[in-house]
Amino acid sequence: MARPKIALIGAGQIGGTLAHLAALKELGDVVLFDIAEGVPQGKALDIAESGPSEKFDADMSGTNDYADIAGADVCIVTAGVARKPGMSRDDLLGINLKVMKSVGEGIRDNAPDAFVICITNPLDAMVWALREFSGLPHHKVCGMAGVLDSARFRHFLADEFNVSMKDVTAFVLGGHGDTMVPLTRYSTVAGIPLPDLIEMGWTTQEKMDAIVQRTRDGGAEIVGLLKTGSAFYAPATSAIEMAEAYLKDQKRVLPCAAYVDGALGLKGMYVGVPTVIGAGGVERVVDINMTKDEQAMFDNSVAAVNGLVEACKAIDETLS
């Protein structure tokens, strides 16, 4: 039986890391695509030459031709411009929208049956645009944001409580930006909700508020430290977690930017929500209950995403 085929659109820092992780996990054969001649080919060869030491069996190739992604089971899109210090994700809108058009058409023409995971920022608007340009079914196109934001939240919580990250669960919903909503009520340590841990004296509300804010600023913190790029290890790991859930039909409950039509009071839009990912793609949205305050924060985040979508329509009239 043929191995799954994984197409990685964009051979930058995230793309290269994705290729390495996919090979290490033996998720399938990898095609690394980029418009820069030599870059995907060089990275693919470098990773392939690590195979004998890492002991993985996976074909690794690089290309500048969309025809080579034909028949891909999974496409992960990282193509576009990354943030620099002082920039917000939203500042990338105009540049990366054009990239999504060419990528969407490339996937539509060559890998129309693929499960597509978008990482390009501003995430929620870009995954919406990518779906529009590609014409793929909504349940086969989603964005990687909530898994990453939740991982950052979990890391900060484990550090605060001095416990294993394996015992920390967390959910971050809403848009992938300053308005994201880390839900402390649905986040736990060994099943104990964070509000209970505050009552137990494990931490204070002030410290928890600071952790929530640091989670929102997680990407900007790394951009500020690197100065010449943005995060790539954690984003790549998060996208691989989603791809693995699809390829292995794991039915994982993961927060991601998915198409919502009816759940959570939303009608026909992409935004970060809890989902179940399996062989059917985004198989369902988990319609959680929110308090009045949580709903207000979520609504604010939804409004911010809608604003970016409207901006996309103003830039490219074919999206209207």
Swiss-Prot record:
The lineage of its organism: Bacteria, Pseudomonadati, Pseudomonadota, Alphaproteobacteria, Rhodobacterales. Its EC number is 1.1.1.37. Keywords: NAD, Oxidoreductase, Tricarboxylic acid cycle. The active site is at 176 (proton acceptor). The gene is mdh. This is Malate dehydrogenase. InterPro entries: L-lactate/malate_DH, Lactate/malate_DH_C, Lactate/malate_DH_N, Lactate_DH/Glyco_Ohase_4_C, Malate_DH_type3, NAD(P)-bd_dom_sf. It is an enzyme of class 1 (oxidoreductase). Substrate binds at residues 83, 89, 121, 152. GO terms for biological process: lactate metabolic process; tricarboxylic acid cycle. The keyword Oxidoreductase applies.
